[in-house]
């Protein structure tokens, strides 16, 4: 149903929570609102301490006061529980010293060895890298150090020795690898890959001058001495077509002053064996010639 005009407006004023007291000069009008129906008084409704529409009466404020007291009590309990332990140091007191704190690890000062002590320790290390207890105690008395310090020194010295050994081995390996990696250049090489000198790779011929293929530091005059006579089996008719006469090719050998004093046969200790071999070869050739 729809209300029209003043009736609709009057109903809105009655049901509105923001209805106000309408005062006339002579009398006070009756308030028709939810607050008046529920029994709220105008003094409590429009009291300046409470905002309009809060809906809190004096009884509600009385119920709120114990909550504030309980909150204060709760804060006191929390503060009492969160207390600094008497065993812990005060924040303003600073940190404990090393003597007062037994849990802190005691750091030992670094031992400084003298030259005499280092010399004796190195001598003992050269004798044995792992000395026994008696040797360490004797050495400790000698160098005026505790036995524990001597033991620790030997441990550190062995570690240093191992590092040096590893470095030496690695340096040797590096040198070997660098030497293998260097390419060797040569004019000519065989199938095996080994380089050859130029005089070794010269042509080999059976011409009338076979001494031309000799190395450059050996002259033809120094190649064959004049007093040298080849075996008779080399001058046989079977080898005349392949080997020329050496005496005709080579000029007389010019011996030095030392060779003038001592002949070649006297200087050669194998002259007797060579002579015997020549005789055997001669007899063998003669025996072969008789059969033919």
UniProtKB/Swiss-Prot annotation:
Main localization (coarse): nucleus
Any single GO CC term annotated in Swiss-Prot or TrEMBL for this entry: nucleus
Stored Gene3D superfamilies: Homeodomain-like
Subcellular location(s) per record: Nucleus
Keywords noted in UniProt: Developmental protein, DNA-binding, Homeobox, Nucleus, Transcription, Transcription regulation
Transmembrane spans: none
Chain location of the short sequence motif OAR per the record: 272-285
Motif range (Octapeptide motif): 32-39
Nuclear localization signal (motif): residue ranges: 278-282
GO biological process: adenohypophysis development; camera-type eye morphogenesis; cell fate specification; embryonic camera-type eye morphogenesis; eye development; eye field cell fate commitment involved in camera-type eye formation; forebrain development; hypothalamus development
Residue numbers spanned by region Disordered: 1-27, 53-72, 85-107
Classification via Pfam families: Homeodomain, OAR
UniProt DNA-binding residue ranges: 106-165
Gene Ontology MF terms: DNA-binding transcription factor activity, RNA polymerase II-specific; RNA polymerase II cis-regulatory region sequence-specific DNA binding
Listed Basic and acidic residues bias regions: 57-72, 92-102
InterPro entries given in the database record: HD (IPR001356), Homeobox_CS (IPR017970), Homeodomain-like_sf (IPR009057), OAR_dom (IPR003654), RAX/RAX2 (IPR043562)
Task performed by this protein: Plays a critical role in eye formation by regulating the initial specification of retinal cells and/or their subsequent proliferation.
Family designation: Belongs to the paired homeobox family. Bicoid subfamily.
Full protein name: Retinal homeobox protein Rx3
Gene: rx3
């Amino acid at each position: 149903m729809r209300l029209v005009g003043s009736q609709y407006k009057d109903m809105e004023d009655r049901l509105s929570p923001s209805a106000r007291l309408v005062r006339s000069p002579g009398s006070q009008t009756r308030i028709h609102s939810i607050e008046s129906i529920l029994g709220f008084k105008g003094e409590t409704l429009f009291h300046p301490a409470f905002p309009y529409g809060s809906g809190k009466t004096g009884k509600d404020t009385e119920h709120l006061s114990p909550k504030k007291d309980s909150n204060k009590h709760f804060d006191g309990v929390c503060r009492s529980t969160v207390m600094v332990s008497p065993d812990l140091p005060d924040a303003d007191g600073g940190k404990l010293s090393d003597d007062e704190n037994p849990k802190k690890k005691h750091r030992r000062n670094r031992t400084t060895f003298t030259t005499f002590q280092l010399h004796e320790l190195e001598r003992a290390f050269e004798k044995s890298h792992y000395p026994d207890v008696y040797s360490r105690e004797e050495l400790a008395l000698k160098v005026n150090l505790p036995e524990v310090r001597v033991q620790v020194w030997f441990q550190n010295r062995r570690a240093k020795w191992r590092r040096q050994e590893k470095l030496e081995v690695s340096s040797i390996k590096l040198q070997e690898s660098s030497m293998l990696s260097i390419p060797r250049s040569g004019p000519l090489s065989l199938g095996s890959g080994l380089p050859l000198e130029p005089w070794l790779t010269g042509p080999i011929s059976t011409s009338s001058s076979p001494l031309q293929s000799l190395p450059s530091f050996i002259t033809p005059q120094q190649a064959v001495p004049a007093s040298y006579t080849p075996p008779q089996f080399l001058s046989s008719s079977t080898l005349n077509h392949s080997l020329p006469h050496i005496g005709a090719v080579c000029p007389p050998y010019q011996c030095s002053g030392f060779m003038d004093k001592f002949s070649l046969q006297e200087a050669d200790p194998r002259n007797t064996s060579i002579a015997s071999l020549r005789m055997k070869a001669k007899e063998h050739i003669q025996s072969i010639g008789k059969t033919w």
